[in-house]
């Protein structure tokens, strides 16, 4: 996520350091992943994290929401901080794509990894944003 700059990376680090992410699998916890960002407070990410690559991509996605809302609330008043539905997925998708491109570059000659990343780009990034939301 380095291309997004030091300020953005500080927000990501703050999320990890200050435990914004509830990743434990507990009884009664909702499945899937969700980021809640109340105005004037830190974001909260709810998800199950089993340390597989799918969960890493989901975490990158939810951190995109968290980073977006932290920056929006820092620079907008309470009435202007929430984006439209058409824009809300852009920062999280950007995070996903940056991680996917980073992994693809690191994969070298590992064709299996490159195929997996390409499938993620279609199955999760594209499908989630353009089929489930619109």
Regions found by a protein language model. Give the residues of each.
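Cation-handling catalytic/transport regions enriched in His/Asp/Glu
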Residues: 1-134
């Amino acid at each position: 996520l380095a291309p997004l700059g030091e300020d953005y990376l500080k927000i990501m680090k703050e999320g990890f350091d200050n435990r914004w992410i509830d990743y434990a699998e507990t009884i009664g916890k909702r499945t899937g992943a969700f980021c809640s960002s109340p105005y004037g407070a830190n974001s909260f990410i709810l998800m199950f994290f089993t340390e597989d690559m799918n969960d890493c991509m989901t975490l990158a996605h939810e951190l995109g929401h968290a980073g977006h809302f932290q920056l929006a609330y820092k620079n907008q008043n309470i009435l202007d901080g929430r984006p439209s539905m058409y824009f809300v997925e852009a920062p999280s998708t950007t995070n996903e794509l940056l991680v996917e491109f980073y992994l693809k570059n690191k994969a070298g000659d590992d064709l299996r990894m490159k195929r997996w990343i390409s499938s993620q780009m279609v199955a999760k990034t594209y499908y989630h944003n353009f089929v489930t939301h619109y």
